[in-house]
Design a protein with these regions (language model features):
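Terminal-region recognition feature
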Residues: 1-128
């Protein structure tokens, strides 16, 4: 016997708590149609909205964040967010095309330690 699990196709807006159809919410790029609250969008999601498909080349992928200032639990947060995002840093940077024009761009990711700019983000930004 196969048990089919129904997937919830509605979400509640984080701001106004309105019930929103998930597909419509995603088509609206995570903006609530009731109150215009903007949901969290990862760097890759934002990149895919901006850059022409297949043109982005990420730069400086060898860089990674370290706890140079000795913040408590920073290593735990780094490990957690590296697993969550697939990157050991907050800033996605590189080159690509927008409307067939060559561009260099950097996109911060709030999913990685709240989008804070550490040494790696600063280095990647200045290299871009």
């Amino acid at each position: 016997m196969t048990i089919q699990r129904e997937i919830d196709q509605e979400i509640n807006c984080a701001s106004c708590q309105a019930k929103i159809d998930l597909e419509k919410y995603l088509q609206a790029h995570k903006v609530c149609p009731v109150c215009n609250h903007h949901g969290i969008m990862g760097a890759e999601e934002r990149l895919n909205l901006i850059v022409d498909a297949g043109t982005f080349i990420e730069h400086d992928t060898e860089l990674y964040s370290v706890n140079t200032l000795g913040f408590p639990d920073y290593e735990t947060k780094l490990d957690r967010d590296t697993k969550k995002t697939g990157r050991p840093y907050e800033l996605l940077s590189g080159t690509g095309q927008i409307g067939k024009h060559n561009v260099a761009l950097s996109i911060g990711d709030v999913s990685f330690i709240g989008g804070t700019m550490g040494a790696v983000a600063g280095e990647k930004l200045t290299r871009t």
